[in-house]
């Protein structure tokens, strides 16, 4: 929806964890403003941003109904679902099924796929291969888990399209980027692409691209090795990585 007269502000960058709440905002038909956070330029460590989230991470939602900034993508999804009365079943067991799979995304899918991205696509030459191999094995198990589950159902949890689908779908784009065969995960790919065809999801991706892509590219090009070390929590300076293999969503 339009940013004109928006009272909701979502701070973020191009990443799956920011895409998740943008999809929810669009699915709910809410007016909101996206604000780019120049993470490669260390904006997340400024006093102004740390006042929004002391952890120095995106996304962060500002909503007058909350009375305080809200960080963590899963918490934002849950809040918006509760606020609007949408995409989260009211009754158990469907409600807890959706919440369980939201937690699977937050505790396993996002962190593990994120680590595989770092160690397989962004680590410096000569890096110890153990980490990449470990996270690849975990990712393979997670992608298989999702494909197996979606062979028997249309949606991830609860019987209908829900916040669990919104949480997991942006991460499913990494299947091929991580070197896995899409044809070996047909149910996962069908589900991913069916969600991608939803008008609200297309609007969300367009808004994210318009707000984040050029701005992020500019700050990334200007970032020093030390800036990137701090962003990636690297313990020693290494040559700036070639980001061409990674599409920030």
How should each PLM-predicted stretch be described?
Residues 10-12, 167-170, 206:
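Short beta-strand segments
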Residues 208-249:
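Acidic/histidine-enriched, glycine/proline-rich intrinsically disordered or flexible terminal extensions
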Residues 108-199, 247-249:
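GST-like fold's C-terminal all-alpha helical module
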Residues 51, 197, 206:
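Phosphate-coordinating loops and pocket residues in cytosolic domains that bind phosphorylated ligands
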Residues 1-133, 147, 235, 239-249:
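GST-like domain detector, emphasizing the conserved glutathione-binding G-site
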Residues 174, 191, 204-205, 212:
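Polyanion-binding and phosphate-handling cores
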Residues 39-40, 190, 210:
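Positions that flank functional sites
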